[in-house]
Amino acid sequence: MWFQLKIEHCPNDKIEEITEELEECGALSITLTDKNDNPVLEPEPGTTPLWPEVIIHALFAQAEEAQYAREQLVAKRPSLHCSLELLADKNWERAWMDDFRPQRFGNRLWVCPTWLPPPEPDAVNLILDPGLAFGTGTHATTSLCLTWLEQADLKNKSIIDYGCGSGILSLAAIKLGAKHVYAVDIDNQALQATQSNAHANHITESQLSISSPEALQNPVHLVIANILLAPLISLKERFHQLLPSGAHLVTSGILEEQAPLLIDAYDSAFTHIATEYCEGWSLLVFTSK
C-alpha cells in the first residue's frame, strides 16, 4: 500500500521549502503538476519552472509518515489544503504503466517501455522507461525533435544534444546512424539519467559522450537543443562557435508565438530554413552562416 499526500494552494515562493520538508518527513517521490494546464514560459537556466497554481503530490510508504507530514505542513501554513489518499500497490503500478505504450516517430523509430515488447522488432527501437524522467517522447517538443531526427540523414554525423535531459534525443540519433553524440546538460540528474538510459540501450562510450556544456570544444555537424526561449537566445554565439558554415541547428522547446522572436535573434549568425508545429509548440531549423 502507498499513501499519497496532495497539497494545494501552495505559494510558488514556498514550493522548494515545502518539498524539502516532505523529503525530511520520508516522502519517496515528489511530483509538481499544473492545476490549470498552463504552458511554462522562459525560466532561467538552472531554475525549476513553475506554473501559476502548482499542486504537489508526495508518495509515502507509511501512513504515519504521510499523516505527520500533513500535520507539520498545515501547522506552519494553515492556508494549505492537504488531502491524503490510499493507493493499492496494483493501482499505483497501473497509474504510471497504463499511460505508457510504444510510440512511433516517423516511419521507423519507436520508443518503448521495458515491460512491453517492441511492436516492430526490426525497426529502430529505443528502450526508455518513464520513471527516469526528463523526457520520454510524450511532450510535443520531444516528439517534434524525434520526428525530425528520424527523417534526417545522420550517417557518420557528429551531434551535440544541448540540454539532453533523459538522453532520448542522443540515443535516438545514435540508433539512427550518428557516428558520435555529445550529450550535455547543466543538471547532474539529467546526466545520470542519460547514462542509465545509454546502458539500457547498449550504447558505448565510443558512440556517446556525457558531460556539462563547458566540456564542448570541437565543431560538429549538428546541434539539437530542446530547451526554452531565454537560454536559446543566450546561447546563440556559443552555438555559432560549435557549428561551421552550413551546419545545422535544430531548436525546440518554444511556443508557436515565440518562434519569430528566436528567428530574429538568430538572424546575424544563422539562416532559418524550416519550421514544424505540434500542439502549439514549434521546432525551428537553421543553418550556420
Curated annotation (Swiss-Prot):
It is an enzyme of class 2 (transferase). Its main location: cytoplasm. One of its GO terms (cellular component) is cytosol. S-adenosyl-L-methionine binds at residues 142, 163, 185, 226. Disulfide bonds: none annotated. Keywords: Cytoplasm, Methyltransferase, S-adenosyl-L-methionine, Transferase. It comes from the Bacteria. It catalyses: L-lysyl-[protein] + 3 S-adenosyl-L-methionine = N(6),N(6),N(6)-trimethyl-L-lysyl-[protein] + 3 S-adenosyl-L-homocysteine + 3 H(+). Belongs to the methyltransferase superfamily. PrmA family. This is Ribosomal protein L11 methyltransferase. It comes from Legionella pneumophila (strain Lens). The lineage of its organism: Bacteria, Pseudomonadati, Pseudomonadota, Gammaproteobacteria, Legionellales. The gene is prmA.
